[in-house]
Amino acid sequence: MMKCLFFLCLCLFPILVFSSTFTSQNPINLPSESPVPKPVLDTNGKKLNPNSSYRIISTFWGALGGDVYLGKSPNSDAPCPDGVFRYNSDVGPSGTPVRFIPLSTNIFEDQLLNIQFNIPTVKLCVSYTIWKVGNLNTHLWTMLLETGGTIGKADSSYFKIVKSSKFGYNLLYCPITRPPIVCPFCRDDDFCAKVGVVIQNGKRRLALVNENPLDVLFQEV
Protein backbone atom coordinates (compact mmCIF):
# COMPACT_ATOMS: atom_id res chain seq x y z
CA MET A 1 0.00 0.00 0.00
CA MET A 2 2.80 2.41 0.91
CA LYS A 3 4.58 1.57 -2.34
CA CYS A 4 1.45 2.47 -4.36
CA LEU A 5 1.13 5.83 -2.59
CA PHE A 6 4.79 6.54 -3.25
CA PHE A 7 4.42 5.94 -6.99
CA LEU A 8 1.21 8.01 -7.06
CA CYS A 9 3.05 10.96 -5.53
CA LEU A 10 5.80 10.63 -8.11
CA CYS A 11 3.21 10.76 -10.89
CA LEU A 12 1.45 13.84 -9.49
CA PHE A 13 4.62 15.81 -8.69
CA PRO A 14 5.40 16.96 -12.29
CA ILE A 15 1.79 18.06 -12.76
CA LEU A 16 1.88 20.14 -9.58
CA VAL A 17 5.21 21.73 -10.54
CA PHE A 18 3.99 22.48 -14.09
CA SER A 19 0.75 24.06 -12.89
CA SER A 20 2.54 26.22 -10.33
CA THR A 21 4.45 28.00 -13.10
CA PHE A 22 1.17 29.51 -14.41
CA THR A 23 -0.09 31.18 -11.25
CA SER A 24 -0.97 34.86 -10.97
CA GLN A 25 2.69 35.51 -10.21
CA ASN A 26 3.74 33.83 -13.45
CA PRO A 27 0.94 34.51 -15.93
CA ILE A 28 0.91 33.20 -19.48
CA ASN A 29 2.04 35.94 -21.85
CA LEU A 30 -0.73 36.04 -24.43
CA PRO A 31 -0.33 38.14 -27.60
CA SER A 32 -1.38 41.73 -26.97
CA GLU A 33 -4.45 43.05 -28.73
CA SER A 34 -4.02 45.25 -31.77
CA PRO A 35 -4.29 48.96 -30.96
CA VAL A 36 -7.66 50.51 -31.67
CA PRO A 37 -7.38 52.63 -34.84
CA LYS A 38 -7.77 56.36 -34.26
CA PRO A 39 -10.19 58.28 -36.49
CA VAL A 40 -8.87 61.28 -38.40
CA LEU A 41 -10.56 64.49 -37.21
CA ASP A 42 -11.41 67.71 -39.04
CA THR A 43 -10.92 71.25 -37.75
CA ASN A 44 -14.17 70.98 -35.78
CA GLY A 45 -13.09 67.80 -34.04
CA LYS A 46 -15.45 65.62 -36.10
CA LYS A 47 -14.46 62.33 -37.70
CA LEU A 48 -13.71 62.55 -41.40
CA ASN A 49 -16.60 61.21 -43.46
CA PRO A 50 -15.91 59.43 -46.78
CA ASN A 51 -19.08 61.05 -48.16
CA SER A 52 -18.04 64.60 -47.26
CA SER A 53 -15.67 67.07 -48.91
CA TYR A 54 -12.74 68.80 -47.21
CA ARG A 55 -10.15 71.41 -47.96
CA ILE A 56 -6.59 70.51 -47.06
CA ILE A 57 -5.34 73.60 -45.27
CA SER A 58 -2.04 74.49 -43.66
CA THR A 59 -1.44 74.60 -39.92
CA PHE A 60 0.30 77.97 -40.46
CA TRP A 61 -0.98 81.41 -41.46
CA GLY A 62 0.14 84.15 -43.81
CA ALA A 63 3.01 83.39 -46.18
CA LEU A 64 3.57 80.04 -44.48
CA GLY A 65 -0.04 79.01 -45.09
CA GLY A 66 -1.97 78.12 -48.20
CA ASP A 67 -4.57 75.53 -49.22
CA VAL A 68 -3.97 72.57 -51.53
CA TYR A 69 -5.48 72.93 -55.01
CA LEU A 70 -5.71 71.29 -58.44
CA GLY A 71 -3.72 73.04 -61.15
CA LYS A 72 -2.04 72.55 -64.50
CA SER A 73 1.42 70.99 -64.41
CA PRO A 74 4.10 72.95 -66.30
CA ASN A 75 4.86 71.53 -69.77
CA SER A 76 2.16 68.88 -69.35
CA ASP A 77 0.28 67.61 -72.40
CA ALA A 78 -2.57 66.20 -70.27
CA PRO A 79 -6.05 67.30 -71.45
CA CYS A 80 -7.04 68.33 -67.92
CA PRO A 81 -5.42 69.99 -64.88
CA ASP A 82 -3.12 67.32 -63.48
CA GLY A 83 -0.98 68.79 -60.70
CA VAL A 84 -1.37 68.96 -56.92
CA PHE A 85 -0.27 72.38 -55.69
CA ARG A 86 -0.46 74.58 -52.62
CA TYR A 87 -1.22 78.29 -52.67
CA ASN A 88 1.62 80.61 -51.64
CA SER A 89 -0.43 82.16 -48.85
CA ASP A 90 -3.61 81.60 -46.88
CA VAL A 91 -4.78 85.03 -48.08
CA GLY A 92 -6.46 84.47 -51.42
CA PRO A 93 -8.28 81.60 -53.15
CA SER A 94 -9.58 78.64 -51.20
CA GLY A 95 -8.27 75.18 -51.96
CA THR A 96 -9.92 72.58 -54.16
CA PRO A 97 -12.19 70.27 -52.10
CA VAL A 98 -11.13 66.64 -51.79
CA ARG A 99 -12.72 63.48 -50.52
CA PHE A 100 -10.94 60.58 -48.86
CA ILE A 101 -11.75 57.06 -50.03
CA PRO A 102 -10.60 54.46 -47.47
CA LEU A 103 -10.18 50.75 -48.09
CA SER A 104 -12.43 50.18 -45.08
CA THR A 105 -15.65 51.97 -44.21
CA ASN A 106 -14.07 54.67 -42.05
CA ILE A 107 -11.08 57.00 -42.23
CA PHE A 108 -8.44 56.13 -39.65
CA GLU A 109 -4.90 57.25 -39.00
CA ASP A 110 -2.14 55.22 -40.64
CA GLN A 111 -4.45 53.32 -43.00
CA LEU A 112 -4.40 53.20 -46.79
CA LEU A 113 -6.75 55.44 -48.73
CA ASN A 114 -7.19 57.25 -52.02
CA ILE A 115 -7.55 61.03 -52.34
CA GLN A 116 -9.74 62.60 -55.00
CA PHE A 117 -10.46 66.22 -55.88
CA ASN A 118 -14.23 66.36 -55.44
CA ILE A 119 -15.29 68.80 -58.15
CA PRO A 120 -17.69 68.72 -61.11
CA THR A 121 -15.85 67.71 -64.27
CA VAL A 122 -16.37 66.29 -67.73
CA LYS A 123 -16.06 62.54 -68.28
CA LEU A 124 -12.67 62.95 -69.93
CA CYS A 125 -11.23 64.48 -66.77
CA VAL A 126 -12.66 62.15 -64.11
CA SER A 127 -9.42 60.20 -63.72
CA TYR A 128 -7.54 63.51 -63.51
CA THR A 129 -9.10 64.15 -60.12
CA ILE A 130 -7.52 61.14 -58.37
CA TRP A 131 -4.17 61.69 -56.69
CA LYS A 132 -1.09 59.67 -57.50
CA VAL A 133 2.68 60.03 -57.42
CA GLY A 134 4.41 60.55 -60.74
CA ASN A 135 7.75 59.32 -62.01
CA LEU A 136 11.04 60.82 -60.90
CA ASN A 137 11.39 64.45 -61.98
CA THR A 138 15.05 64.76 -62.98
CA HIS A 139 15.03 68.57 -62.76
CA LEU A 140 13.79 68.71 -59.17
CA TRP A 141 15.15 65.26 -58.33
CA THR A 142 11.99 64.16 -56.58
CA MET A 143 8.64 62.57 -57.37
CA LEU A 144 5.78 65.03 -57.78
CA LEU A 145 2.15 64.54 -56.78
CA GLU A 146 -0.18 64.63 -59.75
CA THR A 147 -3.57 63.35 -60.81
CA GLY A 148 -4.57 60.51 -63.10
CA GLY A 149 -4.61 57.81 -60.46
CA THR A 150 -7.01 54.95 -59.85
CA ILE A 151 -9.21 54.01 -56.90
CA GLY A 152 -8.73 50.74 -55.05
CA LYS A 153 -5.84 49.40 -57.12
CA ALA A 154 -2.33 48.51 -55.99
CA ASP A 155 -0.51 51.20 -57.92
CA SER A 156 0.88 54.66 -57.17
CA SER A 157 -2.39 56.03 -55.77
CA TYR A 158 -2.31 54.96 -52.11
CA PHE A 159 -1.71 57.42 -49.27
CA LYS A 160 -1.97 57.52 -45.48
CA ILE A 161 -2.85 60.21 -42.96
CA VAL A 162 -0.71 60.18 -39.81
CA LYS A 163 -0.40 62.45 -36.79
CA SER A 164 2.24 65.14 -37.19
CA SER A 165 5.04 65.32 -34.65
CA LYS A 166 4.25 69.06 -34.43
CA PHE A 167 0.59 69.89 -35.01
CA GLY A 168 -2.10 68.56 -37.30
CA TYR A 169 -1.48 65.70 -39.70
CA ASN A 170 1.02 64.57 -42.33
CA LEU A 171 0.32 62.82 -45.61
CA LEU A 172 2.36 59.77 -46.57
CA TYR A 173 2.68 58.06 -49.91
CA CYS A 174 2.61 54.30 -49.43
CA PRO A 175 3.16 52.18 -52.56
CA ILE A 176 2.07 48.57 -52.35
CA THR A 177 5.07 47.39 -54.39
CA ARG A 178 8.35 47.22 -52.49
CA PRO A 179 10.66 50.18 -53.12
CA PRO A 180 13.07 51.41 -54.47
CA ILE A 181 11.79 50.40 -57.91
CA VAL A 182 8.50 52.21 -57.36
CA CYS A 183 9.59 54.76 -54.77
CA PRO A 184 13.30 55.48 -54.18
CA PHE A 185 12.31 58.01 -51.50
CA CYS A 186 10.30 55.53 -49.40
CA ARG A 187 11.79 54.32 -46.15
CA ASP A 188 12.59 50.63 -45.82
CA ASP A 189 10.79 50.22 -42.50
CA ASP A 190 7.24 50.83 -43.65
CA PHE A 191 7.57 51.60 -47.38
CA CYS A 192 6.13 55.10 -47.04
CA ALA A 193 7.44 58.53 -48.01
CA LYS A 194 6.58 61.95 -46.59
CA VAL A 195 4.63 64.46 -48.64
CA GLY A 196 6.04 67.97 -48.58
CA VAL A 197 6.45 70.94 -50.88
CA VAL A 198 8.97 71.90 -53.58
CA ILE A 199 9.07 75.00 -55.76
CA GLN A 200 8.25 74.43 -59.42
CA ASN A 201 8.14 77.47 -61.73
CA GLY A 202 7.43 79.73 -58.76
CA LYS A 203 4.58 77.58 -57.47
CA ARG A 204 4.48 75.29 -54.46
CA ARG A 205 4.09 71.74 -55.71
CA LEU A 206 3.36 68.77 -53.47
CA ALA A 207 6.12 66.18 -53.75
CA LEU A 208 7.91 63.43 -51.85
CA VAL A 209 10.49 64.77 -49.41
CA ASN A 210 13.05 63.37 -47.00
CA GLU A 211 12.38 66.00 -44.34
CA ASN A 212 10.04 68.88 -43.47
CA PRO A 213 6.75 67.17 -44.33
CA LEU A 214 3.69 69.33 -44.89
CA ASP A 215 1.60 69.78 -41.73
CA VAL A 216 -2.07 70.01 -42.65
CA LEU A 217 -5.61 70.16 -41.28
CA PHE A 218 -8.90 69.14 -42.87
CA GLN A 219 -11.68 71.71 -43.11
CA GLU A 220 -15.13 70.45 -44.06
CA VAL A 221 -16.68 72.23 -47.01
UniProtKB/Swiss-Prot annotation:
Name of the molecule in the record: Aspartic protease inhibitor 1
GO CC terms of this entry: vacuole
Compartment list: Vacuole
Disulphide-bonded residues: 80-125, 174-186
Description of what induces expression: By methyl jasmonate and wounding; but not by sucrose.
Residue(s) at site: Reactive bond for chymotrypsin: 143-144
SMART domains linked: STI (SM00452)
Keywords associated with the record: Aspartic protease inhibitor, Disulfide bond, Glycoprotein, Protease inhibitor, Serine protease inhibitor, Signal, Vacuole
GO molecular function per UniProt: aspartic-type endopeptidase inhibitor activity; serine-type endopeptidase inhibitor activity
Gene3D superfamilies in the cross-refs: 2.80.10.50
Function: Inhibitor of cathepsin D (aspartic protease). May also inhibit trypsin and chymotrypsin (serine proteases). Protects the plant by inhibiting proteases of invading organisms.
Residues glycosylated per entry: 51
Motif segment (Vacuolar targeting signal): 26-31
Other information: Has a single chain structure.
Signal peptide, first to last residue: 1-23
InterPro entries named among the record's database cross-references: Kunitz_inhibitor_STI-like_sf, Prot_inh_Kunz-lg
Tissue specificity note: Tubers, young leaves and flower bud. Not detected in root, stem or mature leaves.
Site, as annotated: Reactive bond for trypsin: 99-100
Superkingdom of the source species: Eukaryota
Protein family per UniProt: Belongs to the protease inhibitor I3 (leguminous Kunitz-type inhibitor) family.
Species of provenance: Solanum tuberosum (Potato)
Main location as per UniProt: other
Residues of the propeptide: 24-32
